């Protein structure tokens, strides 16, 4: 199971379509303030974050997950516009496992969902 924390419709459709084709189980959390609780509840193998989402506070959620013994082992991956170098640095400081440019994420989506 993969939990996606994003509110970008384009990427939601891309992920849903790829997951359906591969038979991957994906859950989308779009409710502000609920992402960390949902990830803790679902215990996914991967949590994917749109680091450009101001509404869903992905950096705060990643920091919360990585500071909790119950969730710190969950693999986290974020995608972000490559020009937002401060966001990339902040995500790494929060403890995210991997950060990809939006284009690289879209290109590697099938591979990411298989892992």
List the predicted regions and their residue ranges.
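Acidic, metal-coordinating helix/loop segments flanking the phosphotransfer/catalytic sites
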Residues: 31-46
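Conserved acidic segment of CheY-like receiver
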Residues: 1-9
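Conserved phosphotransfer cores of two-component systems
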Residues: 42, 66-72
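Output/docking surface of receiver
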Residues: 95-107
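Alpha4 helix (beta4-alpha4-beta5 surface) of REC/receiver domains from two-component response regulators
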Residues: 83-98
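Conserved phosphotransfer microenvironments
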Residues: 49-64
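A short, hydrophobic beta-strand element within the central beta-sheet of small alpha/beta folds
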Residues: 73-82
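Short hydrophobic/Thr-rich beta-strand motif most characteristic of the beta2 strand and flanking loop
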Residues: 24-30
């Amino acid at each position: 199971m993969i939990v996606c924390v994003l509110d970008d419709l384009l990427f939601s459709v891309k992920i849903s379509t790829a997951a359906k084709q591969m038979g991957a189980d994906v859950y989308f959390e779009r409710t502000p303030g609920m992402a960390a609780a949902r990830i803790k509840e679902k215990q996914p193998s991967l949590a994917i974050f749109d680091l450009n989402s101001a509404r869903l506070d992905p950096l705060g959620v990643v920091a919360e997950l990585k500071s909790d013994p119950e969730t710190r082992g969950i693999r986290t991956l974020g995608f972000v516009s490559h020009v937002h170098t401060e966001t990339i640095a902040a995500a790494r400081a929060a403890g995210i496992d991997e950060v990809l440019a939006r284009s690289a994420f879209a290109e590697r989506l099938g591979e990411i969902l298989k892992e």
